[in-house]
Amino acid sequence: MPKTVKNPKNNKSRSRGAPIQVAESIGSGSAKIKKKIRDIERLIKKNPNLPADKKIEYDRALKGLKVELQNSQVQNKAKVLAKKYHMVRFFERKKAVRKLKNLRKEFERISQTGIRKDIKKARKQLRHGEIDLAYVILFPKTEKYISLYPSPNDEDQTDPNVIKGLKITEERRREFRKYIEKLMEEGKLPFSIDDALQGKNIRLDNDKTQKAVLTEEIDAPEQKQDEQQEEQDDFFE
């Protein structure tokens, strides 16, 4: 039986016209996406005379994979930071809830007095309490969490680098609180304050759309004794 002779031109043609398979790389993790990007870039480099339609196809695939890689890296970073600051955020949320409940009771009490000046002040404090609670819930998972109730800093307060760092931290905290306040004023907060007060877990599906999913509170176990909760909350005073 005569041997089949392979035509190298056909092989070259197939390599030039081979379709790009990127679907299996989507959602597969950064390592596989990076490998796929390298494969396509290598293919383009080895075939400078690709047909125009294939060149467009490969370029589009590269752009899509690079976006997917960026999303994957952001998600990985969010997972790391979420784990790192999980307990800090949990206790700060508990503290913000407790403070807001007290502010609501105080506002109701003062409202009954009919004293405008006191009512106005209490209303402002109430709004600040609502902003604090929303801050803890909405602070981006892709950033190092900036505490609302930071513990005393043992670093040298005269060190220029320390002073600069504290200033940047305070500016970011103030900036995000203003962002929360704007959302509330425009009625765009993706959840209700009452839901947060009821202890529901509010998970954002997408930071851009700010779509909230409400479930049972599962962040961490409840303290069995109120004194234990108070002691842990006071850690952030």
Curated annotation (Swiss-Prot):
InterPro entries: Efg1, EFG1_rRNA-proc. Keywords: Coiled coil, Nucleus, rRNA processing. Residues 53-113, 166-186 form a coiled coil. GO terms for cellular component: nucleolus. It holds the Pfam family Efg1. Belongs to the EFG1 family. Involved in rRNA processing. This is rRNA-processing protein EFG1. It comes from Candida albicans (strain SC5314 / ATCC MYA-2876) (Yeast).
